[in-house]
């Protein structure tokens, strides 16, 4: 079973600004969500990579791709994507907190409980 949003973030809460996305990016995010929900992580990753090519600085795309990479067991890339998302998520505290939550999960998977605790603290500070 996939964990949806990080704890403390309502499911889909980080994607509340969907309406602001371009049509193709929004369509790819929707497709990726359906693929991920159906257990097709490779398909979801592929859809999100396409969305990233269209909107390389959209933190929602980076968040979702980090989430999929984490579910695929690629914690190092998940952390990298979430950190990149943070650089573009200024002024969006819920999204920033969600990205920090993903970083915490990624660090835990990489055997870094101290780094995970720091990321969780950062998520709390952000909100």
Regions found by a protein language model. Name each.
Residues 18-46:
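Alpha-helical segment of the N-proximal tetratricopeptide repeat
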Residues 51, 84-85, 89, 122-123:
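Canonical positions in the second alpha-helix
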């Amino acid at each position: 079973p996939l964990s949806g949003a990080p704890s403390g973030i309502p499911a889909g809460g980080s994607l509340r600004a969907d309406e602001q996305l371009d049509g193709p990016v929004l369509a790819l995010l929707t497709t990726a969500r359906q693929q991920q929900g159906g257990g097709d992580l490779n398909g979801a990753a592929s859809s999100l990579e396409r969305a990233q090519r269209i909107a390389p600085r959209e933190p929602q795309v980076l968040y979702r791709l980090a989430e999929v990479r984490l579910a695929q067991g690629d914690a190092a890339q998940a952390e990298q994507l979430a950190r990149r998302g943070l650089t573009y998520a200024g002024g969006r505290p819920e999204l920033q907190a969600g990205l920090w939550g993903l970083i915490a999960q990624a660090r835990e998977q990489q055997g870094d409980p101290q780094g995970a605790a720091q990321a969780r603290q950062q998520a709390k500070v952000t909100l």
